């Protein structure tokens, strides 16, 4: 789980990104001070160095684009099993209807 210091730096970086401002150590520190959050001094520098040269907006907007392929493969397997499941349901319905004809409801008074 992320610590308070990590989350504070992440949120500060997201605020700067949303305002189209360059993410620098000084600006992250400014936001943290304005929010009244105290973090270890190495966190803002660590985050700004990790985010250098990355296109964060494209990363955020394309988060789910790579995930779509996995469910499609699982769906194909389920589609091949569907006819077998339908046949089983038909057989169960036939058995139930035969039992209903035999019972006729007279077991209610037993």
From Swiss-Prot:
Residues 69-83 have a biased composition (Low complexity). Keywords: Phosphoprotein, Ribonucleoprotein, Ribosomal protein. One of its GO terms (molecular function) is ribonucleoprotein complex binding. Plays an important role in the elongation step of protein synthesis. It holds the Pfam family Ribosomal_60s. The modification Blocked amino end (Ala) is found at residue 2. One of its GO terms (biological process) is cytoplasmic translation. Belongs to the eukaryotic ribosomal protein P1/P2 family. This is Large ribosomal subunit protein P1. The modification Phosphoserine is found at residue 97. It comes from Artemia salina (Brine shrimp). The lineage of its organism: Eukaryota, Metazoa, Ecdysozoa, Arthropoda, Crustacea. InterPro entries: P1/P2_N_sf, Ribosomal_P1/P2, Ribosomal_P1/P2_euk. Part of the ribosomal stalk of the large ribosomal subunit; P1 and P2 exist as dimers which assemble on the P0 scaffold.
């Amino acid at each position: 789980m992320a610590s308070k210091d990590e989350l504070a730096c992440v949120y500060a970086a997201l605020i700067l990104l949303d305002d189209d401002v360059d993410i620098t150590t000084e600006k992250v520190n400014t936001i943290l001070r304005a929010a009244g959050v105290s973090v270890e001094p190495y966190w803002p520098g660590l985050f700004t160095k990790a985010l250098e040269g990355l296109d964060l907006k494209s990363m955020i907007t394309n988060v789910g684009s790579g995930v779509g392929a996995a469910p499609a493969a699982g769906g194909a397997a389920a589609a091949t099993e569907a006819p077998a499941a339908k046949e089983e349901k038909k057989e169960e319905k036939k058995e139930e209807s035969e039992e209903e004809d035999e019972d006729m409801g007279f077991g209610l008074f037993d």
